[in-house]
Curated annotation (Swiss-Prot):
Subunit relationships: Part of the 30S ribosomal subunit. Contacts proteins S9 and S11.
Family: Belongs to the universal ribosomal protein uS7 family.
GO BP: any one term: translation
A Pfam family hit: Ribosomal_S7
Key words of the record: Ribonucleoprotein, Ribosomal protein, RNA-binding, rRNA-binding, tRNA-binding
MF annotations from Gene Ontology: rRNA binding; structural constituent of ribosome; tRNA binding
Function recorded in the entry: One of the primary rRNA binding proteins, it binds directly to 16S rRNA where it nucleates assembly of the head domain of the 30S subunit. Is located at the subunit interface close to the decoding center, probably blocks exit of the E-site tRNA.
Annotated source species: Mycolicibacterium gilvum (strain PYR-GCK) (Mycobacterium gilvum (strain PYR-GCK))
This protein's name: Small ribosomal subunit protein uS7
Top-level taxon: Bacteria
Length: 156
């Protein structure tokens, strides 16, 4: 355990194309092996494809997708006596954004389209329409929390 307390949050810069912190976070989630320019090419390509398919601002589409994917509840393991309970807890806003981006990117990688640009674009479009694997993951997370509601009094 560190004695100095939690590390300070580093400020995120807005991305140069759309001026959005959310796009910057998405680029950082797509990033592999430090290849930032490749990650930017993938994200900007996906957002451009989303613009072509919907005819609307891609950042608005991304925000709508994020609203459909962000979880409000999750379960955490809590050991009480000899048993481990799945205790439902509310998700902090910054964590919900992080989880939503993580799910969008991971389920994009699992899709069957040819390029990562197409996969990410289609996952974002599906999520903005309330479809797709990332939205299903959120629903499953909420179902788990609802099923374990009886253990909510073990919150810490």
């Amino acid at each position: 355990m560190p004695r100095k307390g939690p590390a300070p949050k580093r400020p995120l810069v807005n991305d140069p194309v759309y001026g959005s912190q959310l796009v910057t976070q998405l680029v950082n989630k797509v990033l592999l092996d430090g290849k930032k320019s490749l990650a930017e090419r993938i994200v900007y390509g996906a957002l451009e494809q989303a613009r072509e398919k919907t005819g609307t601002d891609p950042v608005v589409t991304l925000k709508r997708a994020m609203d459909n994917v962000k979880p409000s509840l999750e379960v955490r393991s809590r050991r009480v006596g000899g048993a481990t309970y799945q205790v439902p807890v509310e998700v902090r806003p910054d964590r919900s954004v992080t989880l939503a981006l993580r799910w969008l990117v991971s389920f994009s990688k699992a899709r069957r389209e040819k390029t990562m640009i197409e996969r990410l674009a289609n996952e974002i479009l599906d999520a903005s329409n309330g479809l797709g694997a990332a939205v299903k993951r959120r629903e499953d997370t909420h179902k788990m929390a609802e099923a374990n509601r009886a253990f909510a009094h073990y919150r810490w």
